[in-house]
Amino acid sequence: MKQLPWRADPLVWGHGPRVFEVFLEPTCPFSVRAFGKLDDLLAQAGEDRIMIKIRLQSQPWHMYSGVIVRCILAASTLAGGKEAAKSVMAAVAAHREEFEFERHCRGPNLDATPNDIIARIEGYSGVNVAEAFGIPDLDREIKWHCKYARQNGIHVSPTFMIDGLVQADMGSGDAIADWASRLLKG
């Protein structure tokens, strides 16, 4: 069977000169908080002034992180591209507890399979990711996100970079106005 060509749509919004990279793990509560602020940040700061790039930071203590990250990137290969991926991220964020283990080691998800997780994502997001999840070399995109984070010394989520420099003093609890102010000065 011949494999069809595919392309993962970059998770990038805005087209301004200031680049804000956000390293997120989709089930991390702090990443979820940061993710929830990105649309408002883009609106406040201006699409012509900043560019937001989401980098996926899979973390093994979030037990289904790898499956969920693959679903997000699979969604980015579909007709909706980055917006489909964003819908998957939003669905996971809105139902975070249903994709996580209690204290990272127990609870109902012990009995969940990757197919169960995919079905939940499809049900909540309305994005049919199952077929794209099976793209054999989709792992090259996953590995790119991992390698990019590692080369930049990123170990936790969320982590923020402005114009290629890690901003260790920025956090998900910061006000959107503070993020915007920081991005727009320079």
Regions found by a protein language model. Name each.
Residues E21-P26, V32-N115:
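Structural alpha/beta surface segment adjacent to cysteine/selenocysteine redox centers
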Residues K2, A8, V22-Q44, D111-G186:
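C-terminal cap of thioredoxin/glutaredoxin-like
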Residues R7-G16:
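Short beta-strand-to-loop junctions in surface cap/lid or active-site-entrance loops
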Residues H15, S58, A75, H104, ...:
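A general structural-boundary detector
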